[in-house]
């Protein structure tokens, strides 16, 4: 989606759908970081990547890709702590 203007709800939903499809493809090909592994991601998920980059503002694409990695790292850290006996605080 070109431009820096505010996205309408339908445009945001289209972006989110494209993001989810791209991330689903990355998951199927065991690719976590779409930025670091850009070449591999482009080969495995070219149609989904193109749709994601077309339907979302560039800053959103970068944000979503970085957030995906951060979220994974956070989940891995939680699993490690739980394996060491850490308890969740309420």
UniProtKB/Swiss-Prot annotation:
Q: Which segment of the chain is annotated as a signal peptide?
A: none
What InterPro entries is this protein classified in?
Answer: COA6_fun, COX6B-like, CX6/COA6-like_sf
Q: Name one GO biological process term.
A: mitochondrial cytochrome c oxidase assembly
Q: Where is this motif: Cx9C motif?
A: 15-25
Cellular component terms (Gene Ontology): mitochondrial intermembrane space; nucleus
Ranges of residues in domain CHCH: 12-64
Q: Which Gene3D superfamilies match?
A: Cytochrome c oxidase, subunit VIb
One Pfam family from the UniProt entry? COX6B
**At which positions is motif Cx10C motif?**
45-56
Sorted alphabetically, which keywords does the UniProt record give?
A: Cytoplasm, Disulfide bond, Mitochondrion, Nucleus
Q: What does this protein do?
A: Involved in cytochrome c oxidase complex assembly and is required for efficient formation of respiratory supercomplexes comprised of complexes III and IV.
**What does the sequence similarity comment in the record state about its family?**
Belongs to the cytochrome c oxidase subunit 6B family.
Entry protein name: Cytochrome c oxidase subunit 6B-like protein new16
